């Protein structure tokens, strides 16, 4: 897949950016073409054009897909290993995949875990990195400001956490609004 200057792309493990230039550079006496990608925070990344596809560089999602990704943040957490090192390896693989749904899953699950029990320093860093990757793509896909997207992501996850935490406390399979209210509000 070839990209052009101005294309909005995603570089797995780094996030979304814009192809600012395509330049030929000499590395180890070998000339090679590189995409110069402007990432959030004024960071620039060079990716060899010949290897871009094999390392997972792709076009950003469209607005319709962005809305679906945001909707996934409202779902309940998915199964994670109780062993932190296995959970960490699983999450690294998800992030390497470049799949935005997997990244959203990591952000939601680790945020839920942080609210429940807290996170290790390593998982806190992973959460921050995954959230930056998620937000960077949603910003470019929706032509929105970073702060607006961060607030939206936080609100969706917080609402989901409250909903699913309450639902998990209710001993019944009926988690209708009426049943949840009966459980937590004393009846007079």
Which residues does each predicted region cover?
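A positional/architectural concept
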Residues: 1-57
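Charge/polar-rich, low-complexity and marginally structured segments
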Residues: 50, 55-188
């Amino acid at each position: 897949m070839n990209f052009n200057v101005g294309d909005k792309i995603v570089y797995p493990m780094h996030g979304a950016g814009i192809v600012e230039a395509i330049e030929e550079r000499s590395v180890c006496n070998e000339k090679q073409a590189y995409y110069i990608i402007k990432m959030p925070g004024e960071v620039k990344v060079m990716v060899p054009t010949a290897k871009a596809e094999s390392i997972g560089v792709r076009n950003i999602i469209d607005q319709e897909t962005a809305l679906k990704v945001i909707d996934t943040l409202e779902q309940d957490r998915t199964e994670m290993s109780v062993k932190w090192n296995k959970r960490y390896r699983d999450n690294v693989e998800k992030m390497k995949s470049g799949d935005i749904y997997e990244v959203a899953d990591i952000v939601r699950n680790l945020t839920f875990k942080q609210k429940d029990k807290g996170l290790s320093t390593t998982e806190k860093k992973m959460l921050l990195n995954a959230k930056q990757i998620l937000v960077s793509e949603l910003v470019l896909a929706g032509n929105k400001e970073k702060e607006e997207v961060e607030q939206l992501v936080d609100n969706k996850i917080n609402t989901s956490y409250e909903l699913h935490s309450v639902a998990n406390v209710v001993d019944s399979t009926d988690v209708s609004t009426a049943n949840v209210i009966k459980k937590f509000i004393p009846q007079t």
